[in-house]
């Protein structure tokens, strides 16, 4: 009995330790691209992945498949690494994620980084009607035209990730807005595309002005630029500090597993104790039955001897009676 209980306890402790190790996950890393997530065809880009200070290895995945591996170069840069893409093409545009390892544990996957290549098609033309100066409450429509046939158009507002719109079209797409508010003012560009990550050159900027407001020179049209460094659209996670839950552990799952494991061990112990008690009870009942049978046998033998003695006495008395007569 004691060896069995000891073996069960050891098994429970080993399983608990193994499950505890497997369920521990490191906090997800952050991922970003420099100089931008929108890269002109042929240009280079760096993809950064930042994890915990104790990270020993980083892995980059592209469209769900392993892409590259990097290890921190020095102790001062243990918490981040750089993955270099020398030439951006339509084959390197898409969704990237990264992981890092610390000890025997691997982190969760980072948020997806959507890397876009531009400059694959002609430059589209963007205009707004009416405009570019409109009054509050008025309806406007942005039109994006591309000579080369495409399937999708994107309209982007400068520095606003939540203001990315897309429309399907062949050579032109319309983006209606309104009634306009002060939130609509700003500078817009459009792109043509055959998919979400391979875009044309950007259009010339078009600035939407709202009348009745104080003039803001920062919203005035700018000269065309050859790179998109100025257009840092947050299509994915920006560079920032590591998440506050850097010591995040799935306590709820661990506790539930421990409780379940403890219940199984307790049930096993109860079952063993019940089996032992039933076995002892059966042995005791068997012993009682044997003892009872022995007592009955002794009583029967005792009665038999008594009867033999009485019979012998009776026989002697019968033999003695005729002689006396």
Curated annotation (Swiss-Prot):
Residues 1-16 form the signal peptide. Residues 42-100, 137-192 form the Ig-like domain. InterPro entries: Ig-like_dom_sf, Ig-like_fold, Ig-like_Receptors_ImmuneReg, Ig_sub, Immunoglobulin_dom. Disulfide bonds join 49-98, 144-190. Glycans are attached at residues 139, 216. The chain crosses the membrane at residues 259-279. Residues 17-258 are extracellular. It comes from the Eukaryota. GO terms for cellular component: cell surface; plasma membrane. Residues 280-325 are cytoplasmic. GO terms for biological process: defense response to virus; detection of virus; immune response-regulating signaling pathway. Interacts with CD3Z and FCER1G. This is Natural cytotoxicity triggering receptor 1.
């Amino acid at each position: 009995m004691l060896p069995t209980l000891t073996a069960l306890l050891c098994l429970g402790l080993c399983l608990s330790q193994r499950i505890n190790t497997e369920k521990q996950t490191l906090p997800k890393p952050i991922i970003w691209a420099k100089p931008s997530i929108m890269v002109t065809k042929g240009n280079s880009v760096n993809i950064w992945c930042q994890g915990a200070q104790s990270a020993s290895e980083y892995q980059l995945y592209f469209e769900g498949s392993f892409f590259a591996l990097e290890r921190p170069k020095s102790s001062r840069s243990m918490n981040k690494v750089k993955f270099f893409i020398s030439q951006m093409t339509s084959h390197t545009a898409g969704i990237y994620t990264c992981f890092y390892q610390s000890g025997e544990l691997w982190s969760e996957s980072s948020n997806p980084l959507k890397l876009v290549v531009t400059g694959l098609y002609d430059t589209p033309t963007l205009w707004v009607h009416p405009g570019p100066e409109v009054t509050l409450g008025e309806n406007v429509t942005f039109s994006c035209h591309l000579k080369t046939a495409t399937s999708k158009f994107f309209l982007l507002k400068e520095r606003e990730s939540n203001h990315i719109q897309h429309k399907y079209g062949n050579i032109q797409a319309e983006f209606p807005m309104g009634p306009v508010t002060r939130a609509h003012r700003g500078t817009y560009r459009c792109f043509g595309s055959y998919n979400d990550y391979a875009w044309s050159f950007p259009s010339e900027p078009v600035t939407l002005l709202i009348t009745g407001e104080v003039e803001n020179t920062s919203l005035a049209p700018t000269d065309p630029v050859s790179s998109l460094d100025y257009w840092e659209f947050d299509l994915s996670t920006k560079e920032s500090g590591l998440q506050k839950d850097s010591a995040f552990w799935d306590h709820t799952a661990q506790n539930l597993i421990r409780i379940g494991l403890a219940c199984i061990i307790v049930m096993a112990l109860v079952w063993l104790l019940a089996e032992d008690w039933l076995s002892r009870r059966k042995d005791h009942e068997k012993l009682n039955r044997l003892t009872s049978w022995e007592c009955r046998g002794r009583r029967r033998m005792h009665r038999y001897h008594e009867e033999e003695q009485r019979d012998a006495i009776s026989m002697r008395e019968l033999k003695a009676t005729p002689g006396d007569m």
